[in-house]
């Protein structure tokens, strides 16, 4: 074995595969990121929330202020979507009525998993000022769909909406892919049966062909002052005789 005496110290430092363990320098630690699949997946989701805006009352006016340059909710990665199939967050802002409840549930079911809900305002959470006397207001949207973050207020300020989004981002950061397959939607909220009365469709597209348009009721024609057709008088007389029986 012949040693090369001309080998300098600089050439020794160029050894590609040294035997000893290399020391981790400060420059190397700043360029290496250690993470898990859950953390990477959650980070990508919380950084690009696409909300579906479901505004039915005055709370939506406060949420509209976030779109402006003063609050600028785009810095959180929020992009408003008009289609539920492209959204992963729905924000219910305003009173939910019995007639609007089936449409809200349908929009929620069309959203892909995982999906989240923010209940914004007192009317959405408990019914608000309509919870006592109104026969059509739903006393809490959590009776229809699961809610992740409750945002009280009448209406909440835009700063409160930002705080709710930050809390939702923290919740998304702690999600686990293994636990997500075991947790069902019914485990996330308290559900009670809501008696919804089925109502016939009003807008059928056949208004011009309706019977009442060609044969208006007798009371209506008398109130307007139109002459009552003989056929209408005969039909009204027959109906009265049938009722008397």
UniProtKB/Swiss-Prot annotation:
UniProt keyword terms in alphabetical order: 4Fe-4S, Iron, Iron-sulfur, Membrane, Metal-binding, NAD, NADP, Plastoquinone, Quinone, Thylakoid, Translocase, Transport
Catalytic activity: a plastoquinone + NADH + (n+1) H(+)(in) = a plastoquinol + NAD(+) + n H(+)(out); a plastoquinone + NADPH + (n+1) H(+)(in) = a plastoquinol + NADP(+) + n H(+)(out)
Any one Pfam family match given in the protein's UniProt record, by short name: Oxidored_q6
A single BP term in Gene Ontology: photosynthesis, light reaction
UniProt-recorded Gene Ontology molecular function terms: 4 iron, 4 sulfur cluster binding; iron ion binding; NADH dehydrogenase (ubiquinone) activity; quinone binding
Details of cofactor binding: Binds 1 [4Fe-4S] cluster.
Coiled coil: none
Positions that bind [4Fe-4S] cluster: 58-59, 123, 154
Membrane topology note: Peripheral membrane protein
Required cofactor(s): [4Fe-4S] cluster
Subcellular location: Cellular thylakoid membrane
InterPro entries associated with the record: NADH_UbQ_OxRdtase-like_20kDa, NADH_UQ_OxRdtase_20Kd_su
Family recorded in the similarity comment: Belongs to the complex I 20 kDa subunit family.
Function text: NDH-1 shuttles electrons from an unknown electron donor, via FMN and iron-sulfur (Fe-S) centers, to quinones in the respiratory and/or the photosynthetic chain. The immediate electron acceptor for the enzyme in this species is believed to be plastoquinone. Couples the redox reaction to proton translocation, and thus conserves the redox energy in a proton gradient. Cyanobacterial NDH-1 also plays a role in inorganic carbon-concentration.
NCBIfam families: nuoB_fam, PRK06411.1
Quaternary structure and partners: NDH-1 can be composed of about 15 different subunits; different subcomplexes with different compositions have been identified which probably have different functions.
Protein name as it appears in the record: NAD(P)H-quinone oxidoreductase subunit K
Higher taxonomy: Bacteria, Bacillati, Cyanobacteriota, Cyanophyceae, Nostocales
Gene behind this protein: ndhK
């Amino acid at each position: 074995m012949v040693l090369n005496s001309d080998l300098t110290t600089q050439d020794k430092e160029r050894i590609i595969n040294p035997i000893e363990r290399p020391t981790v320098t400060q420059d190397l630690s700043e360029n290496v990121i250690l993470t898990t699949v859950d953390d990477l997946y959650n980070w990508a989701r919380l950084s690009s929330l696409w909300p579906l805006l479901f505004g039915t009352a005055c709370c939506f006016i406060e949420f509209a202020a976030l779109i402006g340059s003063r609050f600028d909710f785009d810095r959180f990665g929020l992009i408003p979507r008009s289609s539920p199939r492209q959204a992963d967050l729905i924000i219910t802002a305003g009173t939910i009525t019995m007639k609007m409840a089936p449409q809200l549930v349908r929009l929620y079911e069309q959203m892909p998993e995982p999906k989240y809900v923010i209940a914004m305002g007192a009317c959405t959470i408990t019914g608000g000022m309509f919870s006592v006397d109104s026969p059509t207001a739903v006393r809490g949207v959590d009776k229809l769909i699961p809610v992740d973050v409750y945002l009280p207020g009448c209406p909440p300020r835009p700063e409160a909406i930002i705080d709710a989004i930050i809390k939702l981002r923290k919740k998304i950061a702690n999600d686990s892919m293994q636990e997500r397959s075991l947790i069902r939607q019914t485990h996330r909220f308290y559900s009670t049966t809501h008696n919804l009365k089925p109502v016939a469709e009003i807008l059928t597209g056949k208004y011009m062909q309706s019977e009442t348009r060609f044969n208006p009721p007798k009371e209506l024609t008398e109130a307007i002052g139109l002459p009552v057709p003989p056929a209408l008088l005969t039909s009204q007389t027959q109906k009265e005789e049938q009722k008397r029986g």
